[in-house]
Amino acid sequence: AHMLEPRVRALVSDRVADASLRDAVTELTRVIQPLTLSTDSSDPGDDSATTGTDRTETAAGADAETIRAELADADVTLEDLERVRAFYADLRDELDRRVTDHLDATRPDWRASGSDETDRDVPLRDPTEPGRDEISAWAERAGYGDRVWTCAPAVGAVVERALDAIADTDARYTAPGVGRTIAAWHHEDHTTFFRAIRLEDAHDETAPADSWRRTHAASLALYNCLPSAAIGDRLAAFGGGVLMSATLEPMDVFREVTGLDHLAAQGRPVVEQTHGLPFPPENRASFAVDAPKFTHANRGAPGEETETRLAYVDATARVAACDGNVLVGTPSYTEARWMATALEERLDKPVLLDESSDDRETESLKASFFEGGDKVLVTSLRGTLTEGVDYSGDRLAAAVVCGVPIINTEAPRTRAVIAAYDRRFSEGFETALTVPAVRKARQAVGRVIRGADERGIRVLLDARYARRSWNDVRGYVPAHEREEFQPVTPDMLEVALEQFDASG
């Protein structure tokens, strides 16, 4: 449950793909064409013989009657259909122009080099300042007013029903979904929602050689930065439920961002229960190491031998040298590669590296870690091996968290989320980024002790866990855990580890 809000945020966001706009235009044409053929047809003057043209016009006439009936029921006109079709076609052209301009500005050689395999968001407004997006402004300049946006869902529904009727098939159509997203784009506010062009790696050999569509896929993305109301509305559909995790605190933040306060405001009872760790405290050693803050400014690039990097390798190697399997979590896969290489030079035991991969490779790596003698597994704290994995028994003797795994704050969508949370809570960075990062760190060290008879070592390696400062995170660790994670200096870590080993 601790990841409910960040994971659901994507599910309650919308997007309309370039290809979907293309397909919606095609579907609209299939509905419009019989109406125009029926209107333009005339009596040939000789009904003694039936020609191919006659049969086409007869079929078009029958289809036209069916479509007119659907239009009448939905209060949608032929003019609405034609206007929405023109809007989608022009919108696709505008998307094409903007993607081309973006690639020309950021990667002038993109036509020759192809995709750089990097997905990105191209913001349509300043992410830090809520305001009208550039697509909405373009539409107004192009003469597309409220009507074309607001009637898009009804037009999409008519297209679906009409094509079902005249095609006599049970196909899935694009126009309804496009219409709903287009309407949401128009009516949703500009603080809760952030609008951008989503550009992703793709390969389409049928696209023109000089088109970005050959190597990229683009969509108009409507990101929900504050999904609490949407989550609350969905939770309200249930008679009751339990949201459970060992890392929900701080509870006031969790209640707000997951929609529980939204439910409570509607009169639904929301009850909190907190349970301590039932295992003997003498079986676990928990340390918050006062090492230099593992920020990019302090540590430098992975190839640099800075004092900060040296301190982290030294401390991590001390823990990793302990008997048993050791899990090491870093803020990113790039840092994981660096740490794994550094540990291989220091340790006698095998060092396994988890890289961003598919489920099969991850399961294979996990099996290798569990089999045989003592090993070290280095991974990203944003991966899947630091939470939700069973390390019970002798599978894990220690876990080390290096730094606070705060996500990239330069990404446009992240900056928009921070700005939205700033306006809701006044502490957007802490609510949107710091609290989830600390939860991930706590999840990682929580892999160690899974039963009453297990012993293990838990290490939070960063001064921000150890002592108060302007950007510390110690206050986001629950009080009962803060008492256990006693601050130690890097020099005293080895002594503390030896004392714990002797106590067993």
Q: What residues fall within each predicted segment?
A:
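Conserved coupling segment at the C-terminus of the helicase ATP-binding
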Residues: 1-308, 313-326, 331-334, 338-345
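Beta-sheet entry/capping signal
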Residues: 239-243, 268-272, 286, 325-327, ...
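Short secondary-structure boundary/capping segments
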Residues: 250-251, 255-265, 342-346, 392-397, ...
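A generic structural motif
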Residues: 267-277, 350-362, 483-500
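Short, charged, surface-exposed secondary-structure boundary motifs
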Residues: 281-284, 359-366, 408-415, 488-496
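Conserved RecA-like P-loop NTPase helicase motor core
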Residues: 290-302, 361-464
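Conserved C-terminal RecA-like helicase domain
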Residues: 311, 343-368, 372
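N-terminal targeting/trafficking signals and adjacent low-complexity tails
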Residues: 460-504
